[in-house]
């Protein structure tokens, strides 16, 4: 990326930055949202995580050395926000046993894909170990390679392969039991 474009990206409110963020949003929002839904089991919480990631990208744009790394930054930001959300939920459930009411409004995506199937898969995914769920979400929702998944989660490629294998095996067993 040219030095002039990089300088434009870092400026406060330039058309280049606004266009860059708009392009990132259009290209990656859906995949990031799917990642969040798989990790959290809640579309609303996933939307918040993705929105927060884009806000953080805007807020920290001056420290982003390479705008080409923005996609990886967004993935990591969404994943970290999902982890934080899960930790908060565990803490809240442990300290106050209240049921969280989910918003059951159907989105056009839910209707198209088959809301029941999506909810069933998300429910089964939520029973997996956290790391298995993260790896499977990266590999099959975001369609990242083993290397990209390892970099995003900051684990070895061998760990990605092992968690993928174990996670898929567990998913298959749980789905067979559910049928």
What are these regions (language model features)?
Residues 1-31, 38, 118, 123:
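N-terminal module of bacterial RNA polymerase sigma factors
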Residues 2-12, 20, 93-96, 114-115, ...:
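C-terminal edge and immediately downstream basic/flexible tail or linker adjoining helix-turn-helix-like DNA-binding
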Residues 12-23, 33-52, 62-68, 157, ...:
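Short, charged helix-capping/linker segments at alpha-helix termini
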Residues 19, 23, 101-126:
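Acidic, proline/glycine-rich intrinsically disordered inter-domain spacer in sigma factors
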Residues 48-55, 68-80:
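Structural recognition of an alpha-helix C-terminal capping motif at a helix-to-coil junction
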Residues 59-65, 76-97, 106, 114:
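Arg/Lys-rich amphipathic alpha helix in sigma70-family domain 2
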Residues 79, 83, 153-179:
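DNA-recognition helix of helix-turn-helix
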Residues 123-126, 130-134, 142-159:
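Helix-turn-helix DNA-binding module
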